[in-house]
Amino acid sequence: MAELACFCYPHLENDSYRFIPFNSLAIKCMLTAKVDKKDQDKFYNSIIYGIAPPPQFKKRYNTNDNSRGMNYETPMFNKVAVLICEALNSIKVTQSDVASVLSKVISVRHLENLVLRRENHQDVLFHSKELLLRSVLIAIGHSKEIETTATAEGGEVVFQNAAFTMWKLTYLEHRLMPILDQNFIEYKITVNEDKPISESHVRELIAELRWQYNKFAVITHGKGHYRVVKYSSVANHADRVYATFKSNNKNGNVIEFNLLDQRIIWQNWYAFTSSMKQGNTLEICKKLLFQKMKRESNPFKGLSTDRKMDEVSQIGI
């Protein structure tokens, strides 16, 4: 995760802003600079290579002292920064909005995946600039649209029906901020269209999840799509979701947290996110992840007859 201010800076032109991507040498200057505390939140002028991000975001970049940041010296950093600028420059951002826009925390890996989709000649985003920019504006939280299958970050499609598409995420192969744990495996489910979904299509998805992904929890980050994650990683997801939710509220970026379909979401996660929305502390919310929940009455009794036992997946074992 990183703020938009880690990728670009605003340049006032008439009554709105044009956004310009940072270059890696300017960032490198900022990372070595001694800056007064009072100037930590201001864009840094490298003198030689142009404007750099505010020094308060130093930890967002990979250095000798911090291996968890972005690999900003890779070509992918520039591609992501340029893509963000293209999207922001396609809309009007005024002086009253610019601080709020740049403070938004975004998924770096999501943006890298959109770059990969853009470069894939077989992908609809390669052929449609309008759809590409819509996808980016959704990814950076500047659109009220939810991420649907056409505007999704992408990955490897492992399941699809008339209503849903399930993707295997490819973060292990990333350049900008790769997942280093070689045991990482995670999926994302997007709706094909933002409209009511028939019970039969929900039933098909739940059957697939129950039999092929029975070692995983179905959760949501509140953005209109589902994530299918290992139970061992649920607590980590909870920390991130809670931190992003609080950060957005603090910065005035109040975005409705979409709890999604309770029949699909893991019961404990639904309790966690509901508690978070009510304003409870992280400690109180996380306790709900580890409590034994009273089983809801199964809205889809008989699902077990939809698959034979020899079809049960070993994924995640």
Swiss-Prot record:
Its cofactor is Mg(2+). It comes from the Viruses. This is Non-structural protein 2. Participates in replication and packaging of the viral genome. Plays a crucial role, together with NSP5, in the formation of virus factories (viroplasms), which are large inclusions in the host cytoplasm where replication intermediates are assembled and viral RNA replication takes place. Displays ssRNA binding, NTPase, RNA triphosphatase (RTPase) and ATP-independent helix-unwinding activities. The unwinding activity may prepare and organize plus-strand RNAs for packaging and replication by removing interfering secondary structures. GO terms for cellular component: host cell cytoplasm. It comes from Rotavirus A (strain RVA/Cow/United States/NCDV-Lincoln/1969/G6P6[1]). Gene3D superfamilies: Rotavirus NSP2 fragment, C-terminal domain, Rotavirus NSP2 fragment, N-terminal domain. One of its GO terms (biological process) is viral genome replication. The active site is at 225 (for ntpase and rtpase activities). Its EC number is 3.6.4.-. It is found in: Host cytoplasm. Keywords: ATP-binding, Host cytoplasm, Hydrolase, Magnesium, Metal-binding, Nucleotide-binding, RNA-binding. ATP binds at residues 107-109, 188, 221-223, 227. Residues 205-241 are annotated as: RNA-binding. One of its GO terms (molecular function) is ribonucleoside triphosphate phosphatase activity.
